[in-house]
Curated annotation (Swiss-Prot):
Keywords: Cytokine, Cytoplasm, Immunity, Inflammatory response, Innate immunity, Secreted. This is Interleukin-36 gamma. GO terms for molecular function: cytokine activity. InterPro entries: IL-1_fam, IL1/FGF.
Length: 164
């Protein structure tokens, strides 16, 4: 079942994203390379991207019981993950966008939202815009992507280590 919401939205009276790192079950972390997020083995010589996370301000307008709807971004450079159909396939992309602008938008920005589900110590991130498609990783050095092949060939389970 779903855990309680692991993210804070108010620190010192103002909305503030949480920050952390993501790594898959093969101990591969996310890094920013060539305008994409790719996975590489975790080591002391690798600096993972800092992910930024904010829950959707209006979750009541989205499907219930699918997890916590979140915006997922990175720092340095400030970009957000979003899903778009490219050549007939749901595709995971990065876009220069401020996570707080998405949060304050008067309605949910579905292409930028993911249902976060935590089971035990691992998390999955399902696209709100493309239900049944999850953020996934595969081989070292390859970009993260969307897949509908849940648990078949690709890793859709991640460890989310919140630092704030």
């Amino acid at each position: 079942m779903f855990s309680k919401h692991p993210f804070s939205t108010h620190i010192s009276g103002r909305e503030t994203p949480d920050f952390g790192e993501v790594f898959d079950l093969d101990q591969q972390v996310w890094i920013f390379r060539n305008q994409a997020l790719v996975t590489v083995p975790r080591s002391h010589r690798v600096t993972p991207v800092s992910v930024t996370i904010l829950p959707c301000k209006y979750p009541e307008s989205l499907e219930q019981d699918k997890g916590i709807a979140i915006y997922l971004g990175i720092q340095n450079p400030d970009k957000c993950l979003f899903c778009k159909e490219v050549n007939g396939h749901p595709t995971l992309l990065l876009k220069e966008e401020k996570i707080l602008d998405l949060y304050h938008h008067p309605e949910p920005m579905k292409p930028f939202l993911f249902y976060h589900t935590r089971t035990g110590g691992t998390s999955t991130f399902e696209s709100v815009a493309f239900p049944g498609h999850y953020i996934a990783s595969s081989k070292t050095g390859n970009p993260i992507f969307l897949t509908s092949k849940k648990g078949e060939y690709y890793n859709i389970n991640f460890n989310l280590d919140i630092k704030s």
